[in-house]
Design a protein with these regions (language model features):
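Cytosolic/nucleoplasmic, non-transmembrane interface domains of endomembrane
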Residues: 1-29
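Sequence-level detector for tyrosine residue identity
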Residues: 3-4, 24, 70-73, 108, ...
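Transmembrane alpha-helical segments and their cytosolic interface motifs
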Residues: 19-79
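Cytosolic/matrix-facing juxtamembrane and C-terminal tails of multi-pass cellular membrane proteins
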Residues: 44-51, 87-157
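Transmembrane alpha-helical hairpins and terminal membrane-anchor modules
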Residues: 57-105, 109
Length: 157
């Protein structure tokens, strides 16, 4: 209940943000700045393209609404602007948000072990251990730790 947002797009993006935490214990907000540099260029390019596409759709909506200011010049401005804004908000933006969210989730699905390795954090040994390990890594990145466990792994030569 506390995760719902007022718009469909907000809920799509929130769900994409929550899935890595639900599956792997990795908080997207805290871990993302550390995962981003570890992603291959192809994945980063895809993410940037999806984000740009989402931003462009949002900008189109704004411009459509601003276009309605031309009402004194033509009466068609309001219905045309509202039609474009409505279509963009109800169809285009949610589909682009879904594509962007899917790529974020895929980044965690396929590159989370790289995150552990680059931070010299021990990899979880089983899928059952992964959520607790992810929560511990997230807590360490968020607040640091003065515990003696876990022991950092040695970097590969």
């Amino acid at each position: 209940p506390g995760y719902y947002l007022p718009t469909r797009t907000g809920n799509i993006l929130r769900a994409a943000e929550r899935r890595p935490a639900d599956k792997y214990g990795l908080d997207t907000i805290i871990c993302w700045p550390r995962l981003w540099p570890a992603l291959p260029d192809t994945h980063r390019t895809d993410l940037l393209a999806a984000r740009t596409s989402l931003d462009t759709a949002a900008t189109t909506t704004l411009w459509a609404l601003l276009f309605s200011a031309y009402t004194p010049y033509t009466l068609l401005a309001i219905p045309l602007a509202l039609a474009i804004a409505t279509l963009t908000v109800t169809l285009v933006i949610p589909s682009r948000a879904q594509a962007f969210g899917d790529l974020i989730e895929a980044a965690y699905d396929t590159h989370r072990t790289t995150l552990y390795t680059q931070l010299r954090w021990p990899l979880p040994s089983t899928p059952a251990d992964e959520k607790a390990a992810g929560q511990a890594l997230t807590a360490y990145l968020w607040r640091g730790s003065d515990h003696t466990t876990p022991t950092f792994t040695q970097p590969n030569p």
